[in-house]
Amino acid sequence: MKCTEKACAKVNLTLCVGNKRQDGYHEVTSVMQRISLWDTVTVQRGTGRDRLLCDAPVTEDENDNLCMRAVRVFFAETGLKSDGVTVTLEKRIPMQAGLGGGSSDAAAVLRALRTLYDSGISDGALERMGAKLGSDVPFFIRGGTQLATGRGEVVSPLPPLAAGWFVVVKPAEGYATVEMYRRLDEPGSVLVRNSRYMQDAVAANNVHAVAAELHNSFGRVVPKGSSLRIIKDALRARGALGTLLSGSGSAVFGLFDDREAALAAAEALRETWPLTFLAQPV
């Protein structure tokens, strides 16, 4: 038996990172939005042993991959017995981008296993499993538009954003998440903003108001020589209402209210940055 799931990327419309907690994590408040850029995850049961197949190079040991960790967590938490699971990944979401590709893949594996083993597990239970894998994984169980708090693993649904287009640009450089958090820990780096106005803008499906409220703590600590400013300027020159780093980077997105303008911008920027994508909220 097989089950295929879309593992969609996300962008952070807001990302406010607070001080480090005693457990080593940071307090986070983020309005997160799933977008129509996805990996394809196929899970097949009854293959004799657990294994991972991927059409892109996998940098870590197979057992350390989030998808295979998701397999182990699922069976450990449910008490079900694996009859051998093969996870096949077709990657399209860039890595080291702040778009949540690995976390979304892991969430897709959990959803597929729930279907294949007919376990009847609730979304809430899958979110708790996901929290054992990474802070972003719970968001991807349901996706849509959500408010993330805690270290990012506590998610609450928001009214869906049903307007606007995103042009997402991934430059050649990648940012290490651990290093970006370290930079935020330096004195004077943390700037906390309220996400309440963004929630109101999303609820109203007001793209101009959403663009006005885009903010990300990590934008203050990007490495010297980053392409961030150049990409943001290029997006604005092509009509973006607002631009922002997604997650801890290095992908940057521009928000447009018109599909044709967004499409033209994506085609133009792709000449300089090949990993440029047109997406909408889903």
Per-region residue spans from a language model:
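Solvent-exposed alpha-helices and their adjacent loops that cap or buttress functional pockets
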Residues: 33-34, 131-132, 138-141, 157-162, ...
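Short, basic/glycine-rich phosphate-binding loops at helix/coil junctions
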Residues: 48-60, 109, 206-214
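Conserved, helical-rich catalytic subdomain that frames metal- and/or nucleotide-binding sites
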Residues: 142, 146-242, 257-282
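Short beta-strand scaffold segments in enzyme catalytic cores
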Residues: 15, 39-43, 136-140, 146-147, ...
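Glycine/serine-rich anion-binding loops at beta->alpha junctions
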Residues: 88-117, 135, 241-256
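ATP-binding N-lobe of GHMP and related small-molecule kinases
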Residues: 1-97, 115-127, 160-161, 170-173
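Contiguous, small/hydrophobic- and glycine-enriched helical/loop subdomains that border
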Residues: 83, 106, 110-147
